[in-house]
Regions:
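N-terminal pre-domain segments of enzymes
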Residues: 12-69
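Short, well-ordered loop/turn sites that connect or cap secondary structure elements
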Residues: 85-88
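Short alpha-helix capping/helix-loop boundary micro-motifs
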Residues: 75-80
Length: 275
């Protein structure tokens, strides 16, 4: 095989039966063992909620995020590089769409995604919520649903694409070390943006979630500007947005090729965005 990095690669047969793994995965969200109640969206103790400084744009959807670590396992902390997650980690992302943007009273559960660190590597799974909003079913193939949404300009139809397992891995690639959200720049923020001063990374450290906690105060660690608060300079906000939303493809090792290079630390003159 040829690749964008100019190297040649050879395929190697995997020893694991992927079809057997797929068939064994729980078919309903309520069967995963992570929820005390899917109807109330109540996770069992051990699921740690988190938020990020720059959320990935998701067609007006709101998201709730959780980390679930296996018993006794810890995260390998890195200031700049990707965090290292142990086998058995489950990253949960729950998507909701407001069907009435004027009154914010029409919240609809769309899907709940699992990103699972298995012995064979990372795997993505999508659960699609039923009409009763009581449970969600494991998706086998990608599909699209259309929702009617009330806006200030009238009612519109909004399509929503539910990704297949292969779709998940189109963005969560080896070039990005697979995990896109939980890293130092994204997670270095208040645990509760609405109040309190506890830092999210500091809280994770106090909970014993890191095998190697930060050696410097969290105030000295790098962070993206808070996108929703609009903090930071325009340049920093734009570079953070492009890094989060685009650089997993548009970077030297990404599937979009070497140019443009939209990583956060690439000097502007080397990004190929201007000039």
């Amino acid at each position: 095989l040829t690749a964008f990095d100019g190297n040649l690669y050879r395929l190697r047969r995997r020893d694991v039966d992927l079809e057997a793994v797929r068939a064994a995965f729980p078919k309903r969200l309520s069967e995963t063992g992570l929820f005390a109640s899917t109807e109330e969206l109540e996770l069992l103790p051990g699921a740690v909620p988190y938020s990020v400084n720059v959320p990935l744009w998701s067609d007006h959807a709101e998201k709730e995020r959780f980390i679930v670590l296996p018993a006794g396992a810890k995260i390998g902390f890195e200031e700049q590089a990707s965090w290292r997650f142990p086998v058995g980690t489950v990253l949960v992302k729950h998507f909701l769409l407001d069907l009435d943007r004027q009154t914010a009273s029409g919240e609809q559960r769309l899907e709940t995604r699992f990103f699972v660190r298995s012995p064979e590597g990372w795997k993505g799974y999508t659960y699609v919520w039923n009409e009763a909003q009581t449970d969600a079913d494991l998706l086998d193939e990608a599909m699209t649903r259309t929702y009617r949404v009330k806006t200030a300009d009238g009612e519109i139809e909004q399509p929503w694409y539910f990704p297949s397992r292969a779709d998940c891995m189109a963005c969560h690639t080896r070039a990005t070390d697979f995990v896109l959200g939980p890293n130092t720049r994204q997670m270095n923020r208040k645990l509760d943006p609405a109040g309190g001063d506890a830092n999210q990374i500091g809280t994770f450290a106090r909970l014993g979630m890191f095998e190697n906690p930060p050696t410097r105060p969290v105030e000295e660690l790098e962070r993206y500007p808070d996108w929703e608060a609009g903090s930071g300079t325009t340049d920093a906000l734009v570079r953070a947005y492009l890094d989060v939303n685009c650089s997993f493809c548009h970077s030297p090792a990404g599937i979009g090729g070497k140019r443009p290079d939209l990583r956060f630390h690439t000097p502007l003159k080397e990004t190929a965005m201007v000039g």
